[in-house]
A protein has these predicted regions:
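Activity-critical C-terminal alpha-helical subdomain
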Residues: 188, 437-497
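Alpha-helix capping/hinge segments and adjacent helical runs
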Residues: 28-29, 419-431, 454-456, 460-467
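N-terminal flexible segment immediately upstream of the FAD-binding catalytic core
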Residues: 1-71, 87-118, 267-278, 324-351, ...
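A glycine- and small-aliphatic-rich helix-loop capping segment at beta-alpha/alpha-beta transitions
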Residues: 90-108, 136-140, 163-174, 221-227, ...
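FAD-binding subdomain of flavoenzyme oxidoreductases
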Residues: 109-263, 464, 481-485, 489-497
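C-terminal substrate-recognition/cap domain of FAD-linked oxidoreductases
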Residues: 33-43, 223-227, 233, 238-241, ...
């Protein structure tokens, strides 16, 4: 493991049997897993390069059980890591050897659908795609659609503020969540927002969405649902260079056109996807844009014409528009399968997640190719071009000594480049453990200290998902008093209070 996690608390480990018995009293039946063999599936999330067995796994089924588990752990100084489906690509659900892994998979019911108010109330273990499937017979859907939507859960989406291919027009999770029920580390249950469109007081709902499981455990989510557009068509636009494709993205948005989705892939990704899905992608191009327009038929036809004119000016070598709903879905099936497709051409890959201003796409793509040559590792680029959210897939072989370290260094340089050109370290995958030690590249010590003060207002003992997001010490009394550089403190052996 290349990342450093908090040192296990020997006192907690010595009380393991006592803790397990207490948790079994709160979550009876098969809700507590404590054997190594049965805990093995929980040792990592989607960032499988890092693995660690938890001390114990707890699978509650009710808000009362979640409250009981957290209250007990708070009183007895036991760390807790919440987990949805374990699809996080930043190590956000990486367990702790002296902590409880709190799995929310049993919270899998859609409690209510209110078509008149256009909201649905769901439990956090419901998968993203299941929400849309429950609505589609009535012509509605849930807009955020991460590539992992068949597996990722709404609770995990809230934790990471997930987006997807249609977030350019319809927003991230934070733009589509209206209310939450959440359990604090003390066991207290609070409600934020609701079916109404606004709430008085501080925007705590906005603070919790994207907080990566550091502030509380979500047990219910009220989401906004949308009616399907009258018409939707997708365009495949090929270019001879990635720079031309990146320039076209900026031109389309600059013309005042906001597509339903705008994705980009480079040559390695195009070939991997086409071999895997047979989506009809052109193989003689260096970069491919997928642009979707939705709305009234006349508006869609008009926008397609405008985009065709822009692509000609930008040097597109091919432009094709879907002629049926089946073909539109096939275009998107290729993009949705990009990650597993790339997984077929390399033993391992390391997926990055930075966001940049759209106008910087050509520069960043060129610099990424230079970094690829520097580190001697191939990279396949797949990303949400419309909002500048990059997902470079760094190809490596973990069986070769040193390749994971090179992939990590390559990825860190990409993220530093994103910040350098005015972007941010993450778009939708979260910070987790993966980007934790890069936070000082983007935030000052004062920035990070203020964020930790907010964390301490929700979790005064620092027991909820520790070791994630912040590259500094986790105790509230030390905030602002310890110099941190590159995630390390001076005199680390000095006892802390």
């Amino acid at each position: 493991m290349s990342v450093v996690m908090p040192v296990p608390d020997a006192g907690v480990l010595a009380r393991r049997e006592e803790i397990v018995d207490a948790l079994r009293a709160i979550v009876p039946g098969e809700g507590v897993i404590a054997t190594e063999r049965e805990m093995r599936p929980y040792e990592s999330d989607g960032l499988t390069a890092y693995r660690q067995l938890p001390m114990v796994v707890v699978l509650p089924a009710t808000t009362a059980q979640v409250s009981g588990v957290l209250a007990y752990c708070h009183a007895h100084g036991v760390k807790v890591v919440p987990r949805g489906a374990g699809t996080s690509l930043s190590g956000g659900a990486l367990p702790l050897g002296d902590g409880v892994l709190l799995g929310m998979a049993k919270f899998n019911r859609i409690r209510e659908v209110d078509f008149e108010n256009r909201v649905a109330v769901v439990e956090p273990g419901v998968t993203n795609l299941a929400v849309t499937r429950a609505l589609e017979d009535r012509g509605f859907y849930y807009a955020p659609d991460p590539s992992s939507q068949i597996a990722c859960t709404i609770g995990g989406n809230v934790a990471e503020n997930s987006g997807g291919v249609h977030c350019l027009k319809y927003g991230m999770t934070t733009n589509n969540v209206l209310g939450l029920e959440m359990v604090l580390m003390t066991g207290e249950v609070i409600r934020l927002g609701g079916k109404h469109l606004d709430a008085g007081g501080y925007d705590l709902l906005g603070i919790v969405t994207g907080s990566e499981g550091l502030l509380g455990v979500v047990t219910e989510v009220t989401v906004r649902i949308l009616q399907k557009a009258e018409c939707a068509r997708a365009m495949l636009i090929g270019f001879s260079t990635s720079e031309d494709a990146g320039g076209c993205v900026a031109r389309i948005i600059g013309a005042g056109i906001i597509p339903g989705g705008m994705e980009m892939m480079d040559r390695p990704a195009i070939h991997a996807v086409e071999e895997f899905v047979h989506a009809g992608y052109p193989l003689d191009v260096e970069a491919l844009l997928i642009v979707e327009l939705d709305g009234p038929q006349a508006e869609v036809d008009h926008l397609i014409g405008r985009i065709e004119a822009i692509t000609r000016d930008c040097g597109a070598v091919t432009c094709r528009t879907s002629s049926s709903e089946e073909e539109r879905l096939l275009f998107w099936a290729g993009r949705k399968a990009a990650f597993p497709a790339v997984g077929r051409i390399s033993p391992d890959y390391y997926c990055m997640d930075g966001t940049i201003p759209r106008a910087q796409l050509p520069l960043v793509l060129r610099r990424t190719r230079e970094l690829s040559e520097k580190y001697g590792l191939r990279v396949a680029n797949v990303f949400h071009a419309g909002d500048g959210n990059l997902h470079p897939l760094i190809l490596y072989d973990s069986n070769k000594p040193g390749e994971l370290d090179r992939a990590e260094a390559f990825g860190a340089d990409i993220l530093r480049l994103c910040v350098e050109v005015g972007g941010v370290l993450t778009g939708e995958h979260g910070v987790g453990v993966e980007k934790r030690d890069l936070m000082p590249a983007m935030f000052s010590e004062a920035d990070l200290a203020q964020q930790q003060r907010l964390k301490c207002a929700f979790d005064d003992k620092g027991l909820l998902n520790p070791g994630k997001v912040f590259p500094v010490l986790h105790r509230c009394a030390e905030l602002g008093r310890v110099h941190v550089h590159a995630g390390k403190v001076a005199f680390p052996d000095i006892p802390r209070f």
